[in-house]
Amino acid sequence: MNDSELIFLGTGTSEGIPRVSCLTKSDKMCAVCSDSILPNSPNRRRNTSVLITKKINSQYINIIIDVGKFFYESAINIFPKNNIKTIDSILITHTHADAVGGLDDLRDWTNNLQKEINIYLRQKDFESISKSHNYLVKRNKLTGGGVAKLNFSIINKKPFILHGISFIPLPVMHGKHLEIFGYKFGNISYVSDTSYISKETENLIIGSEILIIDALRPKKTHGTHFTLEEAVEFAKKINAKKTFLTNATHDIDHNRINYQLKKENIDIKYAYDCQKIKIKL
C-alpha cells in the first residue's frame, strides 16, 4: 500500500551533532557544529533511527527501529508535529548505546499512553539488555518510579511478519567481530551501522527501490562504519532508485556534501532529522 511513510528520527552517530566540545572550543570553531544549533539546520543530528508508519483502516501503526540516547529528544521534536501518540513495536539492530540508550524513556508511553510496547531483537541482544537494563527485563528489581513495560520477543535471521509488514533481517558486520541486523521491509533496505556486507546479504538488498545506508564520514576509514566513499560504491552496486545516507559525524556538512554527491550520477544524498519519505509496504 502507498499510504505509508518513513520518518528519520535521527541521522547522526553516537555522540550526535553538535558536539559540546566543539561548541565550547575557544580557538577554532567547528563550522558544522556551529551551524547545527541554528533553527532548522540539517546539520543537527540525533542518534540514527527511523519511524515507519502504516495506515490500517483509520488507524496508524507506528514501528521504530532503534531508540538511542537522543530518542526522547527526537520524540519531543517530531511526534507532536506528526500526531504520533503510541508506539506499536520497536526493532533493535544491536545493543550499543546509540541504539538502545533510550529504552528507559519508554516509560512515558507505558505509564501514560499505552499498556506496553513490544520489542523485537536477537537472543544475544536480549541477553545484553538483561545485563545493562536488568530492571526493564525483570521489572520487580527496581523500586521507586514507574518502569517501562516492555515485552521482548526473540527474532533470528528468518523473515517475520509484524503488523502485516514483512521484515527480512539483513545480517551485516559492525566491526570485525560484531554481527548486527539491518532490515528489509516493503521497498526499503535499512542498514544503519556497517563496515562489511556479505555477498549473501547484498543479494537480499538487491531489488530495493530505496536504500538507507551508513556513511560515517569522508575518506578516513573507520573500523566499524562505512565511509562516504564506501557507501557510494555500495549504493552503485545495489542501484536503488534512491539512496539515503545516515549515521553522519560532524565531518559531514549536509548541504555541501549533498551538492558534491550530484556528480555520482545516481540519486544519493544524506538524509536529515525529521525528513519524511513515502514508502510502499
Range-by-range predicted roles:
Residues 1-191, 200, 258-281:
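Binuclear metal-dependent hydrolase catalytic cores
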Residues 196-281:
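Cap/insert and terminal regions of metallo-dependent hydrolase folds
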